[in-house]
From Swiss-Prot:
This is E3 ubiquitin-protein ligase UHRF1. It comes from Mus musculus (Mouse). The gene is Uhrf1. Residues 450-451 are annotated as: Required to promote base flipping. The tudor-like regions specifically recognize and bind histone H3 unmethylated at 'Arg-2' (H3R2me0), while the PHD-type zinc finger specifically recognizes and binds histone H3 trimethylated at 'Lys-9' (H3K9me3). The tudor-like regions simultaneously recognizes H3K9me3 through a conserved aromatic cage in the first tudor-like subdomain and unmodified H3K4 (H3K4me0) within a groove between the tandem subdomains. The YDG domain (also named SRA domain) specifically recognizes and binds hemimethylated DNA at replication forks (DNA that is only methylated on the mother strand of replicating DNA). The YDG domain contains a binding pocket that accommodates the 5-methylcytosine that is flipped out of the duplex DNA. 2 specialized loops reach through the resulting gap in the DNA from both the major and the minor grooves to read the other 3 bases of the CpG duplex. Pathway: Protein modification; protein ubiquitination.
Length: 782
């Protein structure tokens, strides 16, 4: 097992090899010291937000193959000065050295004076400014960027400081020196708010008729950022599009927010309530007068009830706008608002109840509160895991290091293009695909279990199996073979394999494989009348089967296609116990990988051995570490007496011809039908141009990965099925887009472009056809 260790600044990354999942953190620190030359006591290791502490293993932190651990180097503490050095330093200061530095320290204020000057800014009342007391204005909020109706209650200006000269230029007050005290009409409970002059303007009150609206005009309109079809706040809007049909009027604009940011191409729903912005000094603002009633608020009677559950019915209990426990509205002074979910809770409804309001500024309800006992602080040990305590490895008395096997490292990716119970080929995995380890076969979805030979369910059938020669009764003839069922072996103590010790039974995986036979299940065995009508089984051959079969690969694992169960029966095996035997025959249109046609196809598709990410780099580092002691022995006096050591090879070495010799890859060519379909898909012409460049540079598998990446649905994060190409040239699954429309969201999931939901969505048939050819059966389970 190997992992990546990267410094916190990201400038240096190294691979650490020869690890196990049972490697202690303190042992990992020693290996990191060899690579980074950092002492263990100066290392701070972080993985997934946790600081790794000594005493734990990589398995405790769930560190997997090729994962990255971050290294933060502690600063080494400076040692205290010796008595002699301290005396010499004191004598230097006494003799006058460093006097200039000490004097400058005495005279320096380090910016404290500037901070005090800002705190001493004095404001005084004034009658200056564009807007006076009691005038009705619009005030822009610093959070939303929306404009709210308010009234000026006080105007202040910045007073002159003692340092400023009392000249005509200094006395002249700019608008930036004016601060307005306002109170909001809609939110009187907020009290008085102090705002700058640039966020205040005369209240908008003139409605612009539809026929007077023009593109490029800046107006004030109502818009809801979260729910575009509902009433929201008032924003400045620059009109970008105007359209009128026989039955509807459509107005689109760019919503202006804070700091010059904006929301583009948003549809304005309330086209009859577009207001003209009152520019300064053009018209006098409205002034509060006893003889005139105050102006009507813009949202009065239009926004509807604030609570959509109880419709603001005071006599109806509600758990949304009232107490979340009892739903009562009484005693509002004894209600607490959660700072996370904004729900209200009575003090006496909590468990346990509270006698008074807590003095803390923030309070969280029991559902939102984080249990501090479950939080692992920096420097603390991990909490005990109940799940890991029940594992066989935790209760075993064996001292064997089981963490070095590739079957224990865990999957880094998972096949999601088809469900786990998928019968038949995996889309995008042709016959002849090779992997070095079983965990890679699991990641591809061809055979998901890491160790088990059969993948299936006793009530559904078997989906795949691995022919690895684990049973002496197996007979492999290439296009057909006799397979031995599972079970009958004592695997207690976390064993991987053992000898036959009891009879096998037609249960679990054995029954699942029997269900693939086209005949009723029978406890005594059965034979299919038409074996081709049976359920397909994906077959993977492992290199360990080479001791019994000439069809096994020389290295790793190889996918050999689809087989069908012809018959199954029980018999006494070579071990003397009852075993279940299965006869499987090949039923695949793709050629066998051991034939000449299969080898030509493998070469045409560019199928080569696939290694885990970082495996070859880790192997190269291992080779270098082996060569170093070998050179030391050759240079020593006893080098001539050393014998030849034989080591078992675990993979391709740098000096082996298998690693150095590169086979010539033939570029994959699309069929004439596929090329015509790509030309017909004009909406995705740019995407196809980028994808087709990979045909010249890499093998068939790279081309398929590029297609997956280019045509991935942004909603379900899978390859698009029944794709809909939008006007903005994004591809979304039809089911995902229909689900979005049912939720009243009519914008593109990728770019928020407003989509036309009045007409039915149409599937891009050319794109769907070519995806079905490249990934046959990928729509299974969708």
């Amino acid at each position: 097992m190997w992992i990546q260790v990267r410094t916190m600044d990201g400038k240096e990354t190294h691979t650490v090899n020869s690890l196990s999942r049972l490697t202690k953190v303190q042992e990992l620190r020693k290996k990191i010291e060899e690579v980074f030359h950092v002492e263990p006591q100066l290392q701070r290791l972080f993985y997934r937000g946790k600081q790794m502490e000594d005493g734990h293993t990589l398995f405790d932190y769930d560190v997997r193959l090729n994962d990255t651990i971050q290294l933060l180097v502690r600063q080494s503490l400076a040692l205290p000065l010796s008595t002699k050095e301290r005396d010499s330093e004191l004598s230097d200061s006494d003799s006058g050295y460093g006097v200039g530095h000490s004097e400058s320290d005495k005279s320096s204020t380090h910016g404290e004076g500037a901070a005090e000057a800002d705190d001493k800014t004095v404001w005084e009342d004034t009658d200056l400014g564009l807007y006076k007391v009691n005038e009705y204005v619009d005030v822009r909020d610093n959070i939303f960027g929306a404009w709210f109706e308010a009234q000026v209650v006080q105007v202040q200006k910045r007073a002159l400081s003692e340092d400023e000269p009392c000249s005509s230029s200094a006395v002249k007050t700019s608008e930036d020196d004016i601060m307005y005290h306002v109170k909001y009409d809609d939110y009187p409970e907020h009290g008085v708010d102090i705002v700058k002059a640039k966020n205040v303007r005369a209240r908008a009150r003139t409605v612009i008729p539809w026929e007077n609206l023009e593109v490029g005009q800046v107006v004030m309109a109502n818009y809801n950022v979260d729910y575009p079809r509902k009433r929201g706040f008032w924003y400045d809007v620059e009109i970008c599009r105007k359209r009128q049909t026989r039955t509807a009027r459509e107005l689109y604009g760019n919503i202006r927010l804070l700091n010059d940011s904006q929301l583009n191409n948003c549809r304005i729903m309330f086209v009859d309530e577009v207001l003209m912005i009152e520019l300064p000094k053009e018209r006098r603002p409205l002034i509060a007068s006893p003889s005139q009633p105050p102006p009507a608020l813009r949202n009065t009677g239009k926004s509807g009830p604030s609570c959509r559950f109880c419709k603001d019915d005071e006599n109806k209990p509600c758990r949304k706008c009232a107490c979340h426990v009892c739903g009562g509205r009484e005693a509002p002074e004894k209600q607490l608002l959660c700072d996370e979910c904004d729900m209200a809770f009575h003090l006496y409804c909590l468990k346990p109840p509270l006698t008074s309001v807590p003095p803390e500024p923030e309070w969280y309800c029991p559902s939102c509160r984080t249990d501090s006992s479950e939080v692992v602080q920096a420097g603390e040990k991990l909490k005990e895991s109940k799940k890991k305590a029940k594992m066989a490895s935790a209760t075993s008395s064996s001292r064997r290091d089981w963490g070095k096997g590739m079957a224990c490292v865990g999957r880094t990716t998972e096949c999601t293009i088809v469900p786990a119970n998928h019968f038949g080929p995996i889309p995008g995995v042709p016959v002849g695909t090779m992997w070095r380890f079983r965990v890679q076969v699991s990641e591809s979805g061809v055979h998901r279990p890491h160790v088990a030979g059969i993948h299936g369910r006793s009530n559904d059938g078997a989906y795949s199996l691995v022919l690895a020669g684990g049973y002496e009764d197996d007979v492999d003839n290439g296009n057909y073979f006799t397979y031995t069922g599972s079970g009958g072996r004592d695997l207690s103590g976390n064993k991987r394999t053992a000898g036959q010790s009891s009879d096998q039974k037609l249960t679990n995986n054995n029954r699942a494989l029997a269900l693939n036979c086209h005949s009723p299940i029978n406890e005594k065995g059965a034979e299919a009348e038409d074996w081709r009508q049976g359920k397909p089984v994906r077959v993977v051959r492992n290199m360990k089967g080479g001791k019994h079969s000439k069809y096994a690969p020389a290295e790793g694992n190889r996918y050999d296609g689809i087989y069908k169960v012809v018959k199954y029966w029980p018999e006494r095996g070579k071990s003397g116990f009852l075993v279940w035997r299965y006869l499987l025959r090949r039923d695949d249109t793709e050629p066998e990988p051991w034939t000449r046609e299969g080898k030509d196809r493998t070469r045409q598709l560019g199928l080569t051995m696939q290694y885990p990410e970082g495996y070859l780099e880790a192997l190269a580092n291992k080779e270098k570490s082996r060569k170093r002691p070998a050179k030391a022995l050759e240079q020593g006096p006893s080098s001539s007496k050393t014998g030849k050591s034989k080591q078992k090879s675990t993979g391709p070495t740098l000096s082996s011809p298998r690693a150095s010799k590169k086979s010539k890859l033939e570029p994959y060519t699309l069929s004439e039908q596929q090329a015509n379909l790509i030309k017909e898909d004009k909406g995705n012409a740019k995407l196809w141009d980028d994808v087709l460049t990979s045909l010249q540079d890499g093998p068939y598998q790279i081309f398929l990965s590029k297609v997956k990446e280019a045509f991935q649905c942004i909603c379900c994060q899978e390859l698009v099925f029944r794709p809909v190409t939008t006007v903005c040239q994004h591809n979304v699954c039809k089911d995902c887009l229909d689900r979005s429309f049912r939720a009243q969201v009519f914008s593109c999931p990728a770019c928020r472009f407003e989509l036309d939901h009045s007409s039915p969505t149409r599937v891009n048939q050319p794109l769907q056809t070519i995806l079905n050819q490249l990934f046959p059966g990928y729509g299974s389970g969708r």
